[in-house]
Design a protein with these regions (language model features):
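A structural signal for the main folded, soluble domain(s) of proteins
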Residues: 7, 11-12, 17, 56, ...
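Active-site segment of metal-dependent pyrophosphate-handling enzymes
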Residues: 60-108
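Nudix hydrolase/Nudix homology domain
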Residues: 28-34, 93, 97-153
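Structural signal for conserved beta-strand scaffold positions within catalytic alpha/beta enzyme cores
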Residues: 22, 75, 119-121
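Short histidine-centered catalytic/ligand-binding loop motif
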Residues: 35-45
Length: 153
């Protein structure tokens, strides 16, 4: 199964990441976890179409995501049902996700199963407190996303 993961960001006029948008969601067990925009690519759907659909579904129609002309992911994430060398888990399935850093310029209002969208600085988003709120290894995906944008050099 192929998925897309999108880390929404706000950038300054030079293109540097100033804020990261993290969704807060409740698990079926009642735990609160941080997450990104994510979802599967439907049959006969393009990657670009899947990204736009999930960004609108999770952030609202006025988020105004800025997809790059070339959709090269910052990583290809492989999720396994049990712990593995990838560090990423999804107890439901073995899945592959193309992960993107996507600038958004509009008004974001979380929809679907998200309780809130928090805009944090990269330092805040990488703090141990926030990192602990991710499940399935997604905190490591955030580190990779920000590293791909030159953060932490």
């Amino acid at each position: 199964m192929v998925y897309v993961e999108a880390v929404p960001v706000r950038c300054d006029p030079l293109g540097y990441v100033t804020e990261v948008g993290l969704l807060l969601q409740a698990t079926p067990e009642g735990r609160m976890v941080r997450s990104f925009v994510s979802g599967r690519v439907m049959y006969r759907e393009t990657i670009r179409g899947a990204l736009l659909r999930h960004l609108e579904k999770d952030l609202g129609a006025l988020a105004l995501p800025q997809l790059p002309p070339t959709l090269v992911p910052f990583t290809v994430a492989e999720f396994f049902p049990s712990p593995s060398q990838s560090g990423l888990t999804d107890e439901r399935q073995h899945a592959v996700a193309l992960a993107y850093l996507i600038p958004v310029t509009g008004e974001c209002n979380p929809r679907q199963d998200a309780l809130e969208l928090s805009w944090l600085t990269p330092d805040e988003a990488l703090s141990p407190e926030i990192y602990a709120e991710f499940s399935g290894g997604r905190g490591d995906l955030l580190r990779q996303a920000l590293a791909s944008a030159g953060w932490g050099r």
